[in-house]
């Protein structure tokens, strides 16, 4: 049975959520400009969009923008802790918008929400035209659903939750098993209708590129994460704002003078390290990439291995997009009152499950998303958001102005997919947004900051080989 009614924590929070949305409108000039430019033409009319992205106030304004462009929406969060319940309540009152999201979902509830957001119409195998994804969970569910349905059809083999490596995988496989027993063609039928997905984050893009390389993509994917106006703004400036916000709300510890270890010096790591340095911390970086490592050194940071610094650090932050970055052996060596958190998308950068199941430890919940673990040696360490995104679990994520950049890119990606649904422009591969749209997103935000652009004259344009209106850089240019 298809769930056609929103499921949120408390609908009475909607008025407060709407007020927060109104306040944030002024901080999201890009989205507001898109509404002005495109709203009248309803370019997304009749489009069915499933979103799996953090259900925050800023996300509510993205949903409202897509709705104002004519789309029908079904939405869930991409993290069990990241929903702002007042935002979910507010946006669920909009026409043609159905929301399945609340803070502190269980893993079973989380995957139920993802499945519900992907299931449209009277039949349970009627899905969306397009997906807005963050981390790739909605895309993963469709692809794994098709894979297991094929296995069931050919070999009568069902997903086996007993073979799961962890609790989340068990929930995921249980959902797919039940789904196949109920309708063995559900995900195959849903996948056939999907035009494409626009992916928000590094981890999700990594998943997509793996599938692309193995020719396993079932539909087009647009890589929003690597748009310059996403990667260099959301990833850097967003994390520079929301990491200290999350740490301070969670711990109330002074950061100045402390040793902060940032694992990873990509764009997210750069933003994190910058914020910690600005607060007076002594910042150490761990890196696998010599280019990123030398960038860190040139910015004045110490680059070390985790083994060198693990017993000295006061704060440990992972932001690599990899797995098992901080292992159980590292956690057991940390000094008393060390704080451990993650700002990468998934919870497997830190071996939290291994720690919480380790014999001889004692777990105390200090407050929501803050656990104090007594180790066998008597030291106590503090784990934030159980290894999930601490900036969304312990705070409210990136500020609206930064998210306006990212969500403009998401909107343009959805428009591009929908407008080209009957053309042969895209194959089942991963694509970047074109440069002129990147520049357009930046232009939308300059006025808000009272910035003025210099205009090239005809001679300068001819010399550079560019148009007055851009694009001004080649695709190979590294900002």
From Swiss-Prot:
Cofactor: binding details: Binds 1 NAD(+) per subunit.
EC top class, as a word: hydrolase
Binding site for substrate: 56, 134, 200, 230, 234
GO CC entries: cytosol
Keyword field contains Thylakoid: no
Catalytic activity: S-adenosyl-L-homocysteine + H2O = L-homocysteine + adenosine
Binding site for NAD(+): 201-203, 235, 264-269, 287, 322, 343-345, 391
Cofactor(s) essential for the protein: NAD(+)
A biological process from GO: one-carbon metabolic process
Keywords, in A-Z order: Hydrolase, NAD, One-carbon metabolism
Record-annotated site: Important for nucleoside inhibitor binding: 59
Pathway entry: Amino-acid biosynthesis; L-homocysteine biosynthesis; L-homocysteine from S-adenosyl-L-homocysteine: step 1/1
EC number: 3.13.2.1
Stored PROSITE patterns: ADOHCYASE_1, ADOHCYASE_2
Function noted in UniProt: Adenosylhomocysteine is a competitive inhibitor of S-adenosyl-L-methionine-dependent methyl transferase reactions; therefore adenosylhomocysteinase may play a key role in the control of methylations via regulation of the intracellular concentration of adenosylhomocysteine.
Alphabetical list of HAMAP family matching this protein: AdoHcyase
Subunit structure: Homotetramer.
Official protein name in the record: Adenosylhomocysteinase
Organism: Plasmodium falciparum (isolate 3D7)
Upper classification of the organism: Eukaryota, Sar, Alveolata, Apicomplexa, Aconoidasida
């Amino acid at each position: 049975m298809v769930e056609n009614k929103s499921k949120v924590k408390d609908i009475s929070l909607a008025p407060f959520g709407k007020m927060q949305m109104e306040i944030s409108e002024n901080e999201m000039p890009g989205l507001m400009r898109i509404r002005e430019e495109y709203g009248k033409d309803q370019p997304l009319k009749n489009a069915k969009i499933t979103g799996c992205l953090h259900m925050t106030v800023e996300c509510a304004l993205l949903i409202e923008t897509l709705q104002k462009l004519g789309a029908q929406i079904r939405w869930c969060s991409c993290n069990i802790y990241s929903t702002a319940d007042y935002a979910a309540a507010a946006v669920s009152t909009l026409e043609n918008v159905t929301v399945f999201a609340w803070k502190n979902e269980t893993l079973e509830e989380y995957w139920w929400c993802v499945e519900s957001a992907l299931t449209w119409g009277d039949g349970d195998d009627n899905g969306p035209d397009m997906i807005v994804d963050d981390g790739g969970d909605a895309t993963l569910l469709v692809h794994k659903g098709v894979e297991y349905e094929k296995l069931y059809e050919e070999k009568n083999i069902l997903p086996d939750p007993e073979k799961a490596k962890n609790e989340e995988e068990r929930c995921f496989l249980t959902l797919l098993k039940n789904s196949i027993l109920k309708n063995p063609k559900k995900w195959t039928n849903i996948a056939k209708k999907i035009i494409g997905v626009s992916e928000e984050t590094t981890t999700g893009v990594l998943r997509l590129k793996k599938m692309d390389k193995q020719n396993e993509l079932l539909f087009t994917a647009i890589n929003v994460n690597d748009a310059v106006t996403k990667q260099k703004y959301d990833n850097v400036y967003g994390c520079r704002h929301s990491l200290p916000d999350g740490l301070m709300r969670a711990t109330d510890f002074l950061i100045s003078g402390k040793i902060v270890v940032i694992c990873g010096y990509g764009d997210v790591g750069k933003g994190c390290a910058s914020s910690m340095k600005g607060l007076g911390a002594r910042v150490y970086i761990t890196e696998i990439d010599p280019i990123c490592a030398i960038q860190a050194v040139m910015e004045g940071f110490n680059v070390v291995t985790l083994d060198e610094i693990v017993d000295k650090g006061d704060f440990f932050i992972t932001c690599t997009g990899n797995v098992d970055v901080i292992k159980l052996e590292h956690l057991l060596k940390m000094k008393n009152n060390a704080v451990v958190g993650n700002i990468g998308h998934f919870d497997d950068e830190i071996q939290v499950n291994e720690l919480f199941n380790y014999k001889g430890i004692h777990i105390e919940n200090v407050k929501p998303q803050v656990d104090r673990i007594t180790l066998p040696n008597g030291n106590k360490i503090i784990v934030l958001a159980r290894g999930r995104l601490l900036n969304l679990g312990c705070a409210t994520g990136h500020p609206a102005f930064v998210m306006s950049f990212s969500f403009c890119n998401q909107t343009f990606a959805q428009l591009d997919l929908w407008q080209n649904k009957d053309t042969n422009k895209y194959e089942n591969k991963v694509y970047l947004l074109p440069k002129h749209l990147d520049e357009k997103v930046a232009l939308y935000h300059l006025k808000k900051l009272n910035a003025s652009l210099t205009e090239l004259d005809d001679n300068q344009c001819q010399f550079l080989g560019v148009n007055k209106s851009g694009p001004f850089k080649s695709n190979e240019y590294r900002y």
